[in-house]
């Protein structure tokens, strides 16, 4: 089936059908009703654009690179899943690479994707803000879009969580619990995302007289958090309140506590970035903030596709998407 037939069956012009199928409906203000008419015909007839032919005409490969720091992080994998599905619907292939939160790995991943001649790259960077690696593309038309962790906003477009605001909101909720000892567990303080989450926490806690212990793991991996927390427990009692800046860090704490005590204390108040419905089975109060994965993926892909459309190339800058707050553990049953 050809594009002309899709347009005829949907009752729209060939140009409008092309905008919808190639992900440019919003750019050209095609109504949601028209988009649904076209996509209904596409689904009914299992239509797939000829990506090779389109790529040859446009000098493109119809492929997009994605570099994420951790394939075991469910937040990243959910975003990747939405990105892949939406990109495929628009005739693009998503090539996924993992940096393991190592700067050298990330730079190699980027170089390999460039060798594959991808049309654009989406990256959640593990590089500190002052690192010069991405500056070579600062004035280059090649689209690089930052996901979750921002790049230089003067030259790149970034879609991130509202890290500082989300951390402040989460810490404000945690403050309501009558805990005497508080532990803040983060990782990689040199990353902007880590800095912003700590700033949000400190803002919420600035007028609270309770002492907070700050710990930073050398990675956002579960094992790194477990090792750090286990060593900390050698000289400190179990905290009564815990704030973790990622779900993997919380898992590391839980691993150590369950191995040592067989269960989590019922009076341990937990606040964490990242969410999982299984937290509802815990017998302690849990506060969790989670990204709106579909919204993040849609916005990122919208920016990527707009970046490939020269007349409508978006300006550099930062888009923040606030997370949702969930009450888990015993809070889900009250």
From Swiss-Prot:
The keyword Amino-acid biosynthesis does not apply. Residues 1-58 form the HTH lacI-type domain. CDD domains: HTH_LacI, PBP1_FruR. Gene3D superfamilies: 3.40.50.2300, lambda repressor-like DNA-binding domains (1.10.260.40). Is displaced from DNA by low concentrations of fructose-1-phosphate. It comes from the Bacteria. Keywords: Activator, DNA-binding, Repressor, Transcription, Transcription regulation. Residues 3-22 bind DNA. GO terms for biological process: regulation of DNA-templated transcription; regulation of DNA-templated transcription initiation; response to fructose. InterPro entries: Fruct_sucro_rep (IPR012781), HTH_LacI (IPR000843), Lambda_DNA-bd_dom_sf (IPR010982), Peripla_BP/Lac1_sug-bd_dom (IPR001761), Peripla_BP_I (IPR028082). GO terms for molecular function: cis-regulatory region sequence-specific DNA binding; DNA-binding transcription factor activity; identical protein binding; transcription cis-regulatory region binding. Activation of transcription is observed when the Cra operator is upstream of the RNA polymerase binding site. Inhibition of transcription is observed when the operator overlaps or is downstream of the RNA polymerase binding site. NCBIfam families: fruct_sucro_rep, PRK11303.1. Homotetramer. Global transcriptional regulator, which plays an important role in the regulation of carbon metabolism. Activates transcription of genes encoding biosynthetic and oxidative enzymes (involved in Krebs cycle, glyoxylate shunt and gluconeogenesis, such as ppsA and fbp). Represses genes involved in sugar catabolism, such as fruB, pfkA, pykF and adhE. Binds asymmetrically to the two half-sites of its operator. This is Catabolite repressor/activator. It comes from Escherichia coli (strain K12). The lineage of its organism: Bacteria, Pseudomonadati, Pseudomonadota, Gammaproteobacteria, Enterobacterales. The gene is cra.
